[in-house]
UniProtKB/Swiss-Prot annotation:
Origin species: Daboia siamensis
Catalytic activity: a 1,2-diacyl-sn-glycero-3-phosphocholine + H2O = a 1-acyl-sn-glycero-3-phosphocholine + a fatty acid + H(+)
Record's protein name: Basic phospholipase A2 DsM-S1
Keywords: Disulfide bond, Hydrolase, Lipid degradation, Lipid metabolism, Metal-binding, Neurotoxin, Secreted, Signal, Toxin
Localization, UniProt: Secreted
Protein family according to the UniProt entry: Belongs to the phospholipase A2 family. Group II subfamily. D49 sub-subfamily.
Lineage start: Eukaryota, Metazoa, Chordata, Craniata, Vertebrata
Residues at which Ca(2+) binds: 43, 45, 47, 64
Location, primary (coarse class): secreted
Length: 137
């Protein structure tokens, strides 16, 4: 399922906050969100279940939980704006949903940077069937 989503994103482009999130990831880590984080471990990419494979995957787990706390928002499509001030990500004022989505994405991008040393290519394109259990935030 995740692979299908990745192909769809590549074919139709990325809209909404996914575009901003990808930009944040690149700025913080020097890595392109696709393919580096689009299907990494059990939580990076669409959906998630099981135990995070490493600290990088845990960043995605926390990010999924953050989005889960925004039931009235559309994190994949609602656009927000941010800027950098002295190298730091600053979410610009928007709607309540835009602000909260931006803060979730900001935390994940920073988490990825802080855990670059745990990033392992063996978890890129990680198969879903190896991830067992439910998401428990």
């Amino acid at each position: 399922m995740r692979t299908l989503w990745i192909v769809a994103v590549c074919l139709i482009g990325v809209e909404g906050s996914l575009l901003e999130f990808g930009k944040m990831i690149l700025e913080e880590t020097g890595k392109l969100a696709i393919p580096s984080y689009s299907s990494y471990g059990c939580y990076c990419g669409w959906g998630g279940k099981g135990t995070p494979k490493d600290a990088t995957d845990r960043c995605c787990f926390v990010h999924d939980c953050c989005y889960g706390n925004l039931p009235d928002c559309n994190p994949k499509s609602d656009r927000y704006k941010y800027k950098r001030v002295n190298g730091a990500i600053v979410c610009e004022k928007g709607t309540s949903c835009e602000n909260r989505i931006c803060e979730c994405d900001k935390a994940a991008a920073i988490c990825f940077r802080q855990n670059l040393n745990t990033y392992s290519k063996k978890y890129m394109l990680y198969p879903d069937f190896l991830c067992k259990g439910e998401l428990r935030c």
